[in-house]
Amino acid sequence: MNSFLGLLKKDIKLSRMWLLVWICGIIFLLGTGHIIASRTKEPLVIFGFFVAVAFFLLFLSPVFVFYHLRKEGKSQLWLYNPNGGLWLFSSKLAASLLYQFVIQLALTAYGIWMYHMLSVKNLLEHQVDITSTVALLNMYGLISSLDMSVTVIVFWTVFHSLRNWRGMRWAAMVLLVAMWLFFDEYIISPLVESQKHFWPVTVYCNFDFHFHNVWRLELKPIHLSVLGFPIAIVITFLLLIMASKLLDRKVEV
C-alpha cells in the first residue's frame, strides 16, 4: 500500500499543472456561456455550455492516463520499478479519476444551481426530482471514463509490445480496433441491453426546447439498468489485468 501511495503521489505531482489548465478551460467556457446569455437575454445558453462541458469532461481521465503513460514510456523508469504493472496502471487510473471526481462534484454543484435558477425564472416545462439523476449520472461518468481509460492502457500496452514488429504493428493495431468494435457491438452491448429490465432507474438526461413567448427547457427521462454498472466494472477490471500481465513482461517502450 505504501508503494502504491508513493506512485499515486508521483502521478498527481506530475500532472497537477495540466489539471489547472483543464480547470481554467472549464471556467472560461462556463464564463463565456454566462456572457453570451447576458447579452442575448437567453438564459438557456448557459445550459448549452454546461452540457458541452459535461460531455468533454468524460475524456478527462483517458487524456490524463495517456499523458502519464507517455511520460512513463519516455523515462522508462518503470522498467526498474519493483512494483507490478497492476500497481503502476492503478496509480495512474486513481490519479486521473480523482481529478475527474473532484471536477464532477464542482460541476454537479454548478448544475444544481443552474437548475434552480432556471426554475425560478420559470424556464422549465415541468419540475422533476433530479436527486437520483445527479447521483447516477456522476456514477455513469466515472465508470465510462474508467472504461475509456483502461481501453487507452490496453491499446498503449499492446502497441509497445509489438516493438519488434514495427513494420506490422500499425496494421495489428487496426485489426485490434476492428476486433474491439466487434466485441463491443455484438457482445458487450447486447449483454448490457439484455439486463435493462433488471433494477431499472429513471434518469432525466434527455432534453428538448420549446418556445412559448420564451424558450423553455424540458427534461425527459430515460431508463437505465443499475446492473449495467457492475458488468462494465468487471469487464474493465479483466482488461486491466490483461494489460498488467503484458506490461510485466518488461516490454521496452
UniProtKB/Swiss-Prot annotation:
This is Uncharacterized protein YhcE. Its main location: membrane. Keywords: Cell membrane, Membrane, Transmembrane, Transmembrane helix. The keyword Transcription does not apply. It is a multi-pass membrane protein. The chain crosses the membrane at residues 17-37, 46-66, 93-113, 139-159, 172-192, 222-242. It comes from the Bacteria. The keyword Hydrolase does not apply. GO terms for cellular component: plasma membrane. It is found in: Cell membrane.
